[in-house]
Amino acid sequence: SIMQSSSLVSIISISFISAGLIGLGQGIGIIFGANIGTTTGAWLIAGLGLKVDIATYAMPMLVFGTILMFQSDKKTKGIGYILAGLGFLFLGIAYMKEGFEAFKATLDLTQFAIGGFKGLLIFTFIGILATVIMQSSHATLVLIITALGSGQITYENALALAIGSNIGTTITAVIGSLTSGLEGKKLAGAHVIFNVFT
């Protein structure tokens, strides 16, 4: 949840397994936890970001976060990094909301909506591709939720994009496991299976 990157946690877990620091069961537990933890950002955005003008909270968080980042105490510095990160996240969400709202007048993305099984496959692939390019399922989910909240994509297509995002985040772990031992490959496989079925 703190790292907001299940891909990074997966790669670290595969490295730890390859080095013999943890077992396969522990690695699977870490990956499951990382996958659940990454959803906190999406819940935060869905709960606050689309209902409240979070840009008003972003600037004070950035100011106080920046001030605290330059303190000598490690705890204070850590709080500063967290505040600054949340401030940038909130500001980014606010700008994305404004961007999608501006799109409404000139471009209606719902005209590209595709229903049925064909739409599910196409938008799942787009979600996978977007996540692989951005290297963050969290960033992809932020875009999906923001676009859905502004009415730019249909609910059905948003679900397919989210599924693709969830699957796309496993590709980094699969690539990282290619040079690892058998246990690392098993962990990457567990990561893929977990994300495909959840």
Task: State the predicted function of each range.
Residues 1-3, 125-134:
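Transmembrane alpha-helix interface/packing and boundary motifs in multi-pass membrane proteins
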Residues 9-37, 42-55, 131-168, 177-183:
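Membrane-interfacial helix-loop connectors
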Residues 20, 77-85, 109-118, 131, ...:
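Membrane-interface segments at loop-to-transmembrane junctions
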Residues 26-33, 53-59, 77-88, 188-195:
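Cytoplasmic-side transmembrane-helix entry/capping segments in multi-pass membrane proteins
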Residues 40, 166, 170-171, 192-197:
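Hydrophobic transmembrane alpha-helical segments of multi-pass transport and channel proteins
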Residues 45-48, 64-78, 180-182:
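Membrane-water interface regions at transmembrane-helix termini and the short interhelical loops
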Residues 54-67, 124:
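Transmembrane alpha-helical segments of multi-pass small-molecule transport proteins
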Residues 82-129, 147:
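Helix-loop-helix hairpins and the membrane-proximal interhelical loops
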